[in-house]
Amino acid sequence: MSELSLSYGSADVQVDKRETLFEGYFQVDALILRHRRFDGSWTEGICREIFERGDAVAVLPWHVESDSVILIEQFRPGAIRGDESPWMLEVVAGVVEPGEGDSDVAHREALEEAGCALDALLPVVSYYPSPGACSEQIRLFVGRAVSAAVGEVKGVDTEHEDILVHSVSRTDAIALLDAGKINNGLTIIALHWLARHGDRLRAEWLDP
């Protein structure tokens, strides 16, 4: 496999000013910055507004013995834009709190959102869902599920969560993906990864 390296690094950006424009459940900062151009020169000062919400950890719980994945269904206000439904099928995910490790978040959110106990975690990918406007990085895992509260409604009451837990065969989950029924990027990435690597990982987990 050939290497494709990036032209510049963090030393090639200079943030001259940062100002918080809004601070509520989320935060919006305005940055005045300069960065190196591909001809080697520097840009003039540019204003960019950045949505700050911290990092998140996500996990796709997978019961390898039955070859079924755990998906959760919940309401998402960002999808109130004329779509057929603002409820989505998703993987488990949550924000990383100060002092928490990624594994801690994965286990906590699996229990809170799906009543799901995990006995193994495998990192899949770390990525920026919208780096042109948001600083959030998501770290995605696949987890070996021991149990789950399938058919139950879970979530944290104080966070107004109302989450329905589903168990879907791996084959049916991929079929939902191919039919366009999965419409959020995190779950699309997780299921595409499972479609490519699931057979190998299932064999490893069933016969360690």
Model-identified regions with their sequence ranges:
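Nudix hydrolase/Nudix homology domain
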Residues: 1-13, 17, 73, 84-87, ...
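Acidic/glycine-rich phosphate/pyrophosphate-binding loops and surrounding catalytic core
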Residues: 117-122, 128-129
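Helix N-cap/coil-helix junction residues
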Residues: 115-116, 182
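Short loop segments at secondary-structure junctions
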Residues: 36-38, 63-65, 75, 144-148, ...
